[in-house]
């Protein structure tokens, strides 16, 4: 097997591991009852109000994010980016599996510990899926497009996405139940800390990942 093929296989394997770790982090975040991360706050609110599985709601939300990218890019959406649909399905499938087998902790100390673990895993999963440079998950893809359309970078787009997601999630909660659903102190902590985890992980591993996966 050629070196280039080996790197592609490793690249795809790391991407799939990254998606699984990201999905685990997202699921753990929902189990804390302290507030979910902005990336899934909208589908989580819908799932809780209407009784859908979180994974199913995330898949639908990700498809909407893909459509928004197409609209914002005014038809200049690269055809290979439609692979985001496959990434959406894999992520939502892992979320559904983890959601069914992971219990919800009762004690506050354990909930805080789970929140910390969720943020770490979400950051690592997001970093790995981006670092191998195959296909972004639709939320990150939309954040990148938002940044571009505003003449800014992806970081700006991510902040805009997170803020918008929280506002929309609050609106969904108040309209559906008269109170916030899935938004809490955990949401704020996740929004602030996940980026720090990504930065720290990339500081130690990004170059190594690129060396062993990029042909």
Residue ranges and their predicted role:
Residues 1-215:
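Core subunits and conserved enzymes of cellular information-processing
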């Amino acid at each position: 097997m050629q070196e280039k093929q080996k790197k592609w296989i490793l690249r795809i394997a790391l991407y799939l591991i990254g998606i699984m770790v990201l999905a685990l982090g997202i699921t753990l975040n929902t189990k804390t009852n302290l507030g979910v991360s902005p990336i899934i706050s909208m589908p989580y609110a819908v799932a809780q109000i209407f009784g859908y599985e979180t994974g199913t709601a995330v898949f639908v939300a990700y498809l909407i994010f893909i459509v928004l990218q197409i609209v914002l890019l005014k038809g200049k959406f690269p055809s290979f980016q439609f692979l985001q649909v496959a990434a959406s399905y894999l992520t939502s499938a892992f979320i559904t599996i983890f959601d069914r087998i992971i219990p919800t902790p009762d004690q506050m100390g354990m909930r805080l510990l789970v929140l910390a673990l969720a943020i770490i895993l979400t950051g690592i999963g997001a970093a790995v899926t981006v670092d191998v440079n195959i296909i972004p998950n639709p939320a990150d893809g939309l954040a990148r497009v938002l940044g571009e359309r505003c003449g800014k970078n992806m970081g700006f787009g991510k902040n805009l996405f997170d803020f918008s997601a929280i506002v929309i999630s609050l609106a969904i909660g108040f309209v559906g139940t008269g109170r916030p659903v899935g938004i809490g102190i955990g949401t704020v902590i996740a929004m602030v800390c996940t980026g720090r985890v990504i930065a720290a992980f990339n500081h130690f591993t990004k170059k190594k990942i690129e060396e062993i996966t990029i042909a």
